[in-house]
Amino acid sequence: MCQDQNNTTNENCCLANILEVIVKLQERSEKFDCLGDGCDRPFLGPTPATVCYNTRPVTFYHCSSGSLWTFPYTLNGSSDVSSVFRCEHVEGCCATCRVLAPNPDSSTVSSTPYIPTETFFTINLNCVGALRCLPDTFIACS
């Protein structure tokens, strides 16, 4: 195994620390009105399209093989697999993630490339060798 499997805290788990920051950013984004343009808006820079993001999608890579993690999901009666996830919760060296599916609506895929599924899983971050952050986006999570 890649790391000490008895590690139950995120003290020595750098991936958990990174994912905790992502979860906090995602939670914080839900508390703001994205259309605000005053001094108290929660972001810097211009907002020409007035798009407010609430998700930083991630992918995980196996520690031993370096291959991309995938997880099965069912959406609208069709089953598939995805390698793109939204981290929802981190506890110790484990993360609970939601599987994100490719957006089938080609007219909005440039602004919202993923849609949420109702498939969740918990991953032991000691088994993950690397994670990759994808461009921030908006996911209509309930």
What are these regions (language model features)?
Residues 1-91, 98-142:
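Short glycine-rich, low-complexity segments
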